[in-house]
């Protein structure tokens, strides 16, 4: 199998959401309408239930590290989601990535479509995880890239407009990989492991930019991203504009996330749940659409290297036994690329 996501599986072709939105529809097409949203239990946004905030500078400061490590461990155990502040990623790198992302999605459809996904592939501009003609669809378009390792990049999908996009993505992905390696090293420490046990395998980086198109209130209820847990190891997300919409599932209720300016929203993925033998759990989340304006976000997914086996780490199975299967990453990638976003359905396949 090719290592650049060609041949691992891809979505069935569906019409581009930007094209559909340009038709000024009076109603959302039926495949995008989610009647179940009317019955969902959503925590009011002014409620005190908020995800933890972790300060990376304190984790790295000997004076505060002990307390912050305990707080970090609690966030991973009880939430699987947290906001990361004082992360060390240069503000100018983040802001330039935001600007270039906005500029890319503002391009005419014809220009963006030059970077469209190929059949049976994940990379590029389009949609993902469409596996049947009947499933409900997300009211969003995405642009998906492999950024690390460098030799696995397929530059066919890397835009040349805006002209700075490639250089910006290079700098951004490099800095975020450093942060992810630091966090996974701290996770390993909290689990009683050597830091490289988690940092060494998670060196593949995928970047996905999402544009959730606005929907007029008369169009009915839809979702920009279906409820799911990330199939990857660790995700770092930054919101590009001021439009909120990320919800996480906590105690069977949907909790809206209020991003802190300049912070990354970080979440544990299925791979770390498997490797930790369920000590740290991935969390179901979704994105809702706004009635007035599009929502833009950039997610950096940190995944195992090709040739890696995914399974519970031996030092973490002694007390409670093995809870998950061990499989080759390539096989896992094929599974994750050919399943619709549906809660934790992929992880359920991995349980013993």
Curated annotation (Swiss-Prot):
Record-level Gene Ontology MF annotations: (S)-norcoclaurine synthase activity; metal ion binding; oxidoreductase activity
Annotated Fe cation binding sites: 228, 230, 285
Reactions catalysed: (4-hydroxyphenyl)acetaldehyde + dopamine = (S)-norcoclaurine + H2O
Stored Gene3D superfamilies: B-lactam Antibiotic, Isopenicillin N Synthase, Chain
Cofactor note: Binds 1 Fe cation per subunit.
SUPFAM superfamilies: Clavaminate synthase-like
Needed co-factor(s): Fe cation
One family name in Pfam for this protein: 2OG-FeII_Oxy
Activity control summary: Inhibited by O-phenanthroline, but not by EDTA.
Top EC class for this record: hydrolase
Positions of transmembrane segments: none
Superkingdom per UniProt: Eukaryota
E.C. number: 3.5.99.14
Fe2OG dioxygenase domain sequence ranges: 200-304
Keywords: Alkaloid metabolism, Hydrolase, Iron, Metal-binding, Oxidoreductase
Biological processes per GO annotation: alkaloid metabolic process
InterPro entries found in the cross-reference section: DIOX_N, IPNS-like_FE2OG_OXY, IPNS-like_sf, Oxoglu/Fe-dep_dioxygenase_dom, Plant_2OG-oxidoreductases
Oligomeric form and interacting partners: Monomer.
Known role: Involved in the biosynthesis of the common precursor of all benzylisoquinoline alkaloids such as morphine, sanguinarine, codeine or berberine. Condenses dopamine and phenylacetaldehyde, 3,4-dihydrophenylacetaldehyde or 4-hydroxyphenylacetaldehyde.
Misc. comment: NCS1 is a 2-oxoglutarate-independent dioxygenase-like protein that catalyzed the cyclase reaction without oxygen.
Assigned protein family: Belongs to the iron/ascorbate-dependent oxidoreductase family.
Annotated protein name in UniProt: S-norcoclaurine synthase 1
Organism, as annotated: Coptis japonica (Japanese goldthread)
Gene: NCS1
